[in-house]
Design a protein with these regions (language model features):
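Conserved beta-hairpin
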Residues: 63-76, 81
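Conserved acetyl-CoA-binding loop-helix of GNAT-fold acetyltransferases
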Residues: 97-110, 131
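A short helix-loop-beta-strand connector motif used in the catalytic cores of GNAT acetyltransferases and
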Residues: 50-67, 85
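Terminal substrate-recognition subdomain of acyl/acetyltransferases
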Residues: 124, 147-178
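A short beta-loop-alpha structural element at the N-terminal edge
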Residues: 10-24
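Conserved catalytic-core motifs of GNAT/GCN5-like acyltransferases
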Residues: 116-120, 135-153
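A short, internal acetyl-CoA/4′-phosphopantetheine-binding micro-motif in the GNAT/acyltransferase core
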Residues: 86-96
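Conserved GNAT-fold acetyl-CoA-binding loop/helix
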Residues: 23, 27-54
Length: 178
């Protein structure tokens, strides 16, 4: 169960045939969920309608992408690099605040044990990443299509390996050196 609503959600790896569904989640998430933080010109520069599926496909190539699936629908996705950079994390309108993003994020932590994670978070995503242990490294003002946006460079220190006290030997080593 996610949040207070029961759901049968599965996580799976993205395939080329999923790009159109991802484009819908990306675009609608920005236009619907981002409306409280970004004006129409910002949302249109960030995610034009109709979605540019070819451009998104190009951005996804070279990234690891996991999908949250409910029934036959993509309700969220996360894309990341093996370096620890989280490029995309979006949930579909109607699926927000149900734990979908947290489930996807935890899959990345499991996939990248011992890797520091970092991202450029929107105003909408910043609280999510703060709740998951990230800190703001820098506030950034960036331009997309001539339109200015505020975002946050954020980082989380090395993710502990799942299991009993995986980082203890490292702590002992640091104490001996100090």
């Amino acid at each position: 169960a996610l949040g207070n609503k029961k759901t049968d959600m599965n996580v799976r790896t993205c395939t080329e045939s999923d790009v159109a569904s991802i484009a819908v989640v990306f675009t609608e998430s920005i236009h619907v969920l981002g409306a409280s933080h970004y004006d129409a010109s910002q949302r249109n520069a960030w995610a034009p309608r109709p979605a540019d599926i070819e451009a998104l496909s190009a951005r996804l190539s070279g990234l690891q992408t996991l999908l949250a699936i409910e029934g036959d629908a993509v309700i969220g996705f996360i894309s990341y690099e093996l370096s620890g950079h989280i490029e995309f994390l979006y949930t579909a309108p109607g699926s927000e605040r149900r734990g979908v993003a947290s489930v996807l994020y935890r899959e990345v932590e499991k996939a990248l044990p011992g890797v520091s994670l970092f991202t450029e978070a929107s105003l909408v995503a910043k609280p999510f990443f703060l709740r998951h242990g990230f800190s703001v490294v820098e506030e950034q003002n960036v331009s997309r299509g001539g339109v200015m946006f505020r975002r946050y460079a954020m980082r989380k220190a090395v993710v502990a390996q799942h299991g009993a006290q995986a980082d203890r030997p490292a702590l002992r080593a640091v104490r001996r050196l100090s």
